[in-house]
């Protein structure tokens, strides 16, 4: 096996040699030192991935049955090209052919998918020592959030950190957040004027950062947000990429350098805000103060570095959900003008004909808007795939998954399986008023995860999105441009819309 593996690696190096040589000539202008550095990085990356692949070859116990394996004639890369081009189609076709559990190889790693509610239960009910999250996500999140938080610490410590954050995401804070988000939204859209065409995903991504920073980080951090800091957040967010997931973090890639620089500069902003708050006699009831007052079970308080890392993680983890969901919902409403008008009229019915400032209690009663968000999350969940690393053999549907497999669930596939959802591809917010096969399935709808792994920011995300879209519907009418509805951009790690430009017109008062 080692000899065959060595030949495979040699073949990869030979196959990539001519392409790499041509690319290096263009990038380096023929500079010998630069070419050598790039060649070394390329070779080390292949060796790194190859070692991961070989390390995952584990024998099953006697008599155990492996999941159906989708063969690929392409060594090492496996199904990476087909999957990368159209991942949902790939998974749905595999489900039809092989059933709810199957395996395949990409970039030297073996992935086992659990599709449908029954199979997905294995992942969502698992213990971290069996299906491990850090083994999958640490190299992606640690350079972004920092060391000592999230997936860089043992799971019991991470659970304590999540509990601290969750204690700050409470109804008392949400009631404060509604007016903050409404004010930020009105101020942001002042520059849009009476009518026009705008990239709504870019706009909402910026607005989500502004509102989340104000609500979650406190006024000290929000006061420092400007175009430069917004770009730092964008560079930091760029760390969530396929390259960061697949390649070692020490490679001198431009996106890695931007990510690391942004991390240092944003941390400095947080350090100053934390010190200012610690020195202040004023006690402000917000999440920053919650973390400054929090202690671990052993009585140890959080360090400034831990507080900063947790705040960065809280913002960026939620930013993806809220910005992507908000943008997609805008296009669903623009495509269905009748539904859009119903959502606008609901504002008047619930809040009053003169549309006074929003309150948290009113927000809870906007049931149609709530169902629109829920249906958007069904068809366009921000996270396409949730993963864990198998550390122990796992049995599901009569198959045994060996240690070393990356075990995956796809919310996107689960939330549009024809066995679970009637008219599964239609955007129909009223489906939640009716009986659905999915309503009896525990893991048919999982945009925020489930079980031990459910997202702690779900309630804040709903408050944020509902407040932003309530304000936007009061300000504007939205239309598609020449009937264009965006396709999904699968080159990113979230379901972003392609060319997300929308037409708007201010409502007459």
UniProtKB/Swiss-Prot annotation:
Q: How does it sit in the membrane?
A: Single-pass membrane protein
EC number of the protein: 1.14.14.154
What cellular component terms from Gene Ontology apply here? endoplasmic reticulum membrane
Compartments annotated for it: namely: Endoplasmic reticulum membrane; Microsome membrane
Q: In which pathway does it act?
A: Steroid biosynthesis; zymosterol biosynthesis; zymosterol from lanosterol: step 1/6
What reaction does this catalyse? a 14alpha-methyl steroid + 3 reduced [NADPH--hemoprotein reductase] + 3 O2 = a Delta(14) steroid + formate + 3 oxidized [NADPH--hemoprotein reductase] + 4 H2O + 4 H(+); lanosterol + 3 reduced [NADPH--hemoprotein reductase] + 3 O2 = 4,4-dimethyl-5alpha-cholesta-8,14,24-trien-3beta-ol + formate + 3 oxidized [NADPH--hemoprotein reductase] + 4 H2O + 4 H(+); 24,25-dihydrolanosterol + 3 reduced [NADPH--hemoprotein reductase] + 3 O2 = 4,4-dimethyl-8,14-cholestadien-3beta-ol + formate + 3 oxidized [NADPH--hemoprotein reductase] + 4 H2O + 4 H(+); a 14alpha-methyl steroid + reduced [NADPH--hemoprotein reductase] + O2 = a 14alpha-hydroxymethyl steroid + oxidized [NADPH--hemoprotein reductase] + H2O + H(+)
- Which family does the record assign? Belongs to the cytochrome P450 family.
Q: What is this protein called?
A: Lanosterol 14-alpha demethylase
């Amino acid at each position: 096996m080692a000899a065959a593996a060595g030949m495979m690696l040699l073949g990869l190096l030979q196959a990539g040699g001519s392409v790499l040589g041509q690319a290096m000539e263009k990038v380096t202008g023929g500079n010998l030192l630069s070419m050598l550095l790039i060649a070394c990085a390329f070779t080390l990356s292949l060796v790194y991935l190859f070692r991961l692949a070989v390390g995952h070859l584990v024998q099953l116990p006697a008599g155990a049955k492996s999941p159906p394996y989708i063969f690929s004639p392409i060594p090492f890369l496996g199904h990476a090209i087909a999957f990368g081009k159209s991942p949902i189609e790939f998974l749905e076709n595999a489900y039809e052919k092989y059933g709810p559990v199957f395996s395949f190889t990409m970039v030297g790693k073996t992935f086992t998918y659990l599709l449908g509610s029954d199979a997905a239960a294995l992942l969502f009910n698992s213990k971290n020592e069996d299906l491990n999250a850090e083994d999958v996500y640490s190299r992606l999140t640690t350079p972004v959030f920092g060391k000592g938080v999230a997936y860089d610490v043992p799971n019991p410590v991470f659970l304590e950190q999540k509990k601290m954050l969750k204690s700050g995401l409470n109804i008392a804070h949400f009631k404060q957040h509604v007016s903050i988000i409404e004010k930020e939204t009105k101020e942001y859209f002042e520059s849009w004027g009476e009518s026009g065409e705008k990239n709504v995903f870019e706009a909402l991504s910026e607005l989500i950062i502004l509102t989340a920073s104000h609500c979650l980080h406190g006024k000290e951090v929000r006061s420092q947000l400007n175009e430069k800091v917004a770009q730092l957040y964008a560079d930091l967010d760029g760390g969530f990429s396929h390259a960061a997931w697949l390649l070692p973090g020490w490679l001198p890639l431009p996106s890695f350098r931007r990510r690391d620089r942004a991390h240092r500069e944003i941390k400095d902003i947080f350090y100053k805000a934390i010190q200012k708050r610690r020195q202040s006699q004023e006690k402000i009831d917000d999440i920053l103060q919650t973390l400054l007052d929090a202690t671990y079970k052993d009585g140890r308080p959080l360090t400034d570095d831990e507080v900063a890392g947790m705040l960065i993680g809280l913002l960026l983890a939620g930013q993806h959900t809220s910005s992507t969901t908000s943008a997609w919902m805008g296009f669903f409403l623009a495509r269905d003008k009748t539904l859009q008008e119903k959502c606008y009229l609901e504002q008047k019915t619930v809040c009053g004909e003169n549309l006074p400032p929003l309150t948290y209690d009113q927000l809870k009663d906007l049931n149609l808007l709530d169902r629109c968000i829920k249906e958007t999350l069904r068809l366009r969940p921000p996270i396409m795939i949730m993963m864990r690393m198998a550390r122990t053999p796992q049995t599901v549907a009569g198959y045994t998954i060996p240690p070393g497999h990356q075990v995956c669930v796809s919310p996107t596939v689960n939330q549009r399986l024809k066995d679970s959802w009637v008219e599964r591809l239609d955007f129909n917010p009223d489906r939640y008023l009716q009986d659905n096969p999915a309503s009896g399935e525990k893991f048919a709808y999982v945009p925020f995860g489930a079980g031990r792994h459910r997202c702690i920011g779900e309630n804040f995300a709903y408050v944020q999105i509902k407040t932003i879209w309530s304000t936007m519907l009061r300000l504007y009418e939205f239309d598609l441009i020449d009937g264009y509805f965006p396709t999904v951009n699968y080159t990113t790690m979230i379901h972003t819309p392609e060319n997300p430009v929308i037409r708007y017109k201010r409502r007459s008062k």
